[in-house]
Amino acid sequence: EMSTTHSELELEAIRICQELIRIPSVNYGEGKGDEKAVADYIAALLSEVGIEPTIYESAPGRCNVIARIKGSNSQRPGLVVHGHIDVVPANADDWSVDPFSGVIKDGFIWGRGAVDMKNMDAMILATVRDWKRTGYVPERDIILAFFADEEAGSIYGSHYMVKNHPEVFAGCTEAVSEVGGFSVTVTGGKRLYLIETAEKGIHWMRLTAEGRAGHGSMMNDDNAITRLSEAVAKIGRFEWPQRYSKTVKAFFKRIAEETG
């Protein structure tokens, strides 16, 4: 059950998060996904308080929601606040609860998207709805963007929007993106908030192997597939060197100070 100590704003964020989880928006990859129902729900929440949303459908069912909240100072550059509304698949047999139930258990909201990232989507929505109810006007324009397809390359989401509708981001110089980490509770109940400064990059490789042509009816000791498999296994066994940047060293030092 929800604690009675939560503020009205927190309670709304919790409720919205639960509802978002209950609307499956599973991204299966290779263009197979459907965010329309959750996009319609988000658009309705914004419209309800006078924020005008626009849904951009990049392909059937692949929907992005964009809205602009006007700020008090039009001279200041706009700020994009964005999240994604798709989730990875969930095998119900692997869960102790229905992954699309949004149930509250042990003080946590459970379900696919509770961490990545319908929680953040809910906080954004609850906050801007509160702004409208209380009459708060931000200093700069706030552009809300709820993207499709983040879990499978963003082809139908952010890439589509930037390529086909760059005008919605006109005048923006900064963006607040996906949550970068979570607090860690250490000895004595002290809560530490970790700061992320970089992420691992990606390197695509194309491996080519040659062998002797053959047939399934005869053994072949010069098989290209076997040679390719051995190369992939060798990469997998490689022990990468440990490199500690200044940031990582500072992290170790501060953690040691806080935990003793």
Predicted regions and their residues:
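Acidic/His- and Gly-rich active-site-bordering loop/insert found
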Residues: 3-112, 131-140
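Acidic-enriched catalytic cores of C-N bond-cleaving enzymes acting on peptides and small amides
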Residues: 166-173, 181-190, 196-204, 216-260
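A generic structural motif
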Residues: 115, 150, 211-217
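Solvent-exposed residues in well-ordered beta-strands and their adjoining turns
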Residues: 70, 208-212
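Fold-independent oxyanion-binding glycine-rich loops
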Residues: 83-85, 178-180, 209
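Predominant activation on well-ordered alpha-helical scaffold segments within soluble catalytic domains
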Residues: 14, 18, 43, 122-129, ...
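Acidic/histidine-rich catalytic neighborhood of metal-dependent amide-processing enzymes
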Residues: 109, 115-194
